[in-house]
């Protein structure tokens, strides 16, 4: 069957006229890629129009797009059951598409709620929000429904609203400055920093008996098992909100003003690269540090040259690599996708094998030991850092002195191993015993810590990796 569309209905042409352009061809081959993108967009719109004609909601979609009005009605399509497309759901993934959407060999609707259009697979509300509002949209984590949307994606109803004006982009919250007293005493040496590298951490599986600690700001979405495309319901969010009191946790209230001190506000600012990633094999650093500038990136085991959205470990060589490391590298596959959205960092396991994460910020949220290693199964994701939680901790630690603030440095470092886990329940008990692992440094929080420590009074001994 030819892939060329024989006829484009006028309504499809009108709707395509409102499509948002991503801008830029991306260099050589951009023309061909743009041509393929245009064809895909036309198929996506044509497919949607066909479904909406049967339900009489097509006029409402056109009204929403042309008026750009959020007060329009819901425009819904069935949210589950591949049978509605008259096609079976493929159970294998043929190819990873560079747009971040799964790629299959035929058009269908899968059981996980994702929509298949011409070799690309994604959540329907994300597809059409990208098409008509935000071409740079990467994930459903970046979207939240407006209050009057009755069929929002997160409500998990039989139908899902694809009205692009019923969704908003998640905004990064503005973190209030931390009020820091200027201390006159200068420390002669740095306090010892908790180091979990050589300790034997506890282990936990995700999901587990997770209950957020009441003295921390609730997650959005709240803690719980998050499937490949899942979010918890608003009811669960309200229950989570009842367990704590965010008003009591704001950095301003955690830093009581003492007018006898010389208090200076220290503000948070976003760096050009939100995180830096180093790759290790056992206890040996391999390759150069990857600096992440994009809100979404993958760390995988393939061999394509790395770009701003992809860190390929398959290209990296190591003369000391043994057979165990070689075998593990072959199983990294699609690896892990990292999102930095709205001041929150998520890790999604794309590999066929689990990933293992040690995130002190995440562990503190759930009341685990700071060194706990959490297993993330394939197709699941976990929030591994939250800027607002960190801001509250920082403001609280300022009142406890230089050492308490300095200890937060460890919270800005996240370790993650591929395929093989480590900890008390595993043969490998330290991260440096795992064949393949990465270490993330969150640059924004680290730079904020540096400014706060400088304001508090820098010690005379310089910080180093050995301190």
UniProtKB/Swiss-Prot annotation:
Binding-site list for Zn(2+): 74, 149, 161, 166
Q: Name one Pfam family in it.
A: MH2
Name the principal localization, coarsely classed: cytoplasm
- Give one GO term, molecular function aspect: DNA-binding transcription factor binding
Chain intervals for the UniProt region annotation (Disordered): 207-251
In the record, which positions carry Phosphoserine? 240, 245, 250, 255, 458, 460, 464-465, 467
> At what positions is Phosphothreonine found?
8, 220
Q: A GO term (biological process) for this protein?
A: SMAD protein signal transduction
What residues bear N6-acetyllysine in this entry?
A: 19
Task: List the GO terms this entry assigns under cellular component, sorted alphabetically.
Answer: activin responsive factor complex; chromatin; cytoplasm; cytosol; heteromeric SMAD protein complex; homomeric SMAD protein complex; intracellular membrane-bounded organelle; nucleoplasm
Per its UniProt record, what PROSITE patterns does this chain match?
A: MH1, MH2
Q: N-acetylserine occurs at which residues?
A: 2
**Gene3D superfamilies in the record:** 2.60.200.10, SMAD MH1 domain (3.90.520.10)
Q: Where in the cell is it found?
A: Cytoplasm; Nucleus
Q: What is the effect of changing residue 467 to D?
A: No change in binding to PPM1A
Q: Which disease is it linked to?
A: Congenital heart defects, multiple types, 8, with or without heterotaxy: An autosomal dominant disorder characterized by congenital developmental abnormalities involving structures of the heart. Common CHTD8 features include double-outlet right ventricle, unbalanced complete atrioventricular canal, and valvular anomalies. Vascular anomalies include dextroposition of the great arteries, anomalous pulmonary venous return, and superior vena cava to left atrium defect.
The protein's name in its UniProt record? Mothers against decapentaplegic homolog 2
Upper classification of the organism: Eukaryota, Metazoa, Chordata, Craniata, Vertebrata
């Amino acid at each position: 069957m030819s892939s060329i569309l024989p006829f484009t209905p006028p309504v499809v042409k009108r709707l395509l006229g409102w499509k948002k352009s991503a801008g830029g061809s991306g260099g050589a081959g951009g023309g061909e890629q743009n041509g393929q993108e245009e064809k895909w967009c036309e198929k996506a719109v044509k497919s949607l129009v066909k479904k909406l004609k049967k339900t009489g909601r097509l006029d409402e979609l056109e009204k929403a797009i042309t008026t750009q009005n959020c007060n329009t009605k819901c425009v819904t399509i069935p949210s589950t059951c591949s049978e509605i497309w008259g096609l079976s759901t493929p159970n294998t993934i043929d190819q990873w598409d560079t747009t971040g959407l799964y790629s299959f060999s035929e058009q269908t609707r899968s059981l996980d709620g994702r929509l298949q259009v011409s070799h690309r697979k994604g959540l329907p509300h994300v597809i059409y929000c990208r098409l008509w509002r935000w071409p740079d949209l990467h994930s459903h984590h970046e979207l939240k429904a407006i209050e009057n949307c009755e069929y929002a994606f997160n409500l998990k109803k039989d139908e899902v609203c694809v009205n692009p004006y019923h969704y908003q982009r998640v905004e990064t919250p503005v973190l209030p400055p931390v009020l820091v007293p200027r201390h006159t005493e200068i420390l002669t040496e740095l306090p010892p920093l908790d180091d979990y590298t050589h300790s034997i951490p506890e282990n936990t599986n995700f999901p587990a008996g997770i209950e957020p600690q009441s003295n921390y700001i609730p997650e959005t979405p709240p803690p719980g098992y998050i499937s490949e495309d899942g979010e918890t319901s608003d009811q669960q969010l309200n229950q989570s909100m009842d367990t704590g009191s965010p008003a009591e946790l704001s950095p301003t209230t955690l830093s009581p003003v003492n007018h006898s001190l010389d208090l200076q506000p220290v503000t948070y600012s976003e760096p050009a690269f939100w995180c830096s990633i180093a790759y290790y094999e056992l206890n040996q650093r391999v390759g150069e540090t990857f600096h992440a500038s994009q809100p979404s990136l993958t760390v995988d085991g393939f061999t394509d040259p790395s770009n701003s959205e992809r860190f390929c470990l398959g290209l990296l060589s190591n003369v000391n690599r043994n057979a165990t490391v070689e075998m593990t590298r072959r199983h990294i596959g699609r690896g892990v996708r990292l999102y930095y959205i709205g001041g929150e960092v998520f890790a999604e396991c794309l590999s066929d094998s689990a990933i293992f994460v040690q995130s002190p910020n995440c562990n503190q949220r759930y009341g685990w030991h700071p060194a706990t290693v959490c297993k993330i199964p394939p197709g699941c994701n976990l929030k591994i850092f939250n800027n607002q939680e960190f801001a509250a901790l920082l403001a609280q630690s300022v009142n406890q002195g230089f050492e308490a603030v300095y200890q937060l440095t460890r919270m800005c470092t996240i370790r993650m191993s591929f395929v093989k886990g480590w900890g008390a329940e595993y043969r490998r008990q330290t991260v440096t015993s795992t064949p393949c692992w990465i270490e993330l440094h969150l640059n924004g929080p680290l730079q904020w810590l540096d400014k706060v420590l400088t304001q508090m009074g820098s010690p005379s001994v310089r910080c180093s990796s050995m301190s």
